């Protein structure tokens, strides 16, 4: 029984989370995966891009609330205050890991795009999302369906429910769309997600790529240029 095991599949089985936070994220994704996914195809995901883009922009008010000095980024102290206000039970190590994980450009500050990723990770890790809804009166009811769509999308791509998306899983998901040159498209999308180039995509990497796919980065740059011209 059983066919040949590919190098990528072997890598998946042996993959070990680097931090306690990453282990928690994988466990949370796997719990969510046990409920299944509503996504039917990669095309159905693409059709949701405009709605997801609109939903993620509701994070702006929350970002501004926790950016206490209004300098355009959330520093480590502001993040600790944010976690405390949201009554999330993260210890010091997990807060440090969360900050380090989301500060992708390593400038010691969480930008708006990075904050979107952070909020979605917190949403995933929070057992009782209704608590978040009560705490985040500024836009959270609108954010919850958007975050759930992002989690649902990752669950759809992660066929074997191990908490990671492999290159083969991405290729199969896009191949099913029936598009011409789907293999090339799948490889490009996977490379955009695989930030550390280790051949596996975790939920955090997926989120960063997704913000780019829906155009968050581009619009943020346009806003910054407009603000600079007005200054």
UniProtKB/Swiss-Prot annotation:
InterPro entries: CML21-like, EF-hand-dom_pair, EF_Hand_1_Ca_BS, EF_hand_dom. SUPFAM superfamilies: EF-hand (SSF47473). It comes from the Eukaryota. GO terms for molecular function: calcium ion binding. Keywords: Calcium, Metal-binding, Repeat. GO terms for cellular component: cytoplasm. Pfam families: EF-hand_7. Ca(2+) 3 binds at residues 194, 196, 198, 200, 205. Residues 54-89, 90-125, 145-180, 181-216 form the EF-hand domain. Ca(2+) 1 binds at residues 67, 69, 71, 73, 78. Ca(2+) 2 binds at residues 158, 160, 162, 164, 169. PROSITE patterns: EF_HAND_1, EF_HAND_2. Potential calcium sensor. This is Probable calcium-binding protein CML21. It comes from Arabidopsis thaliana.
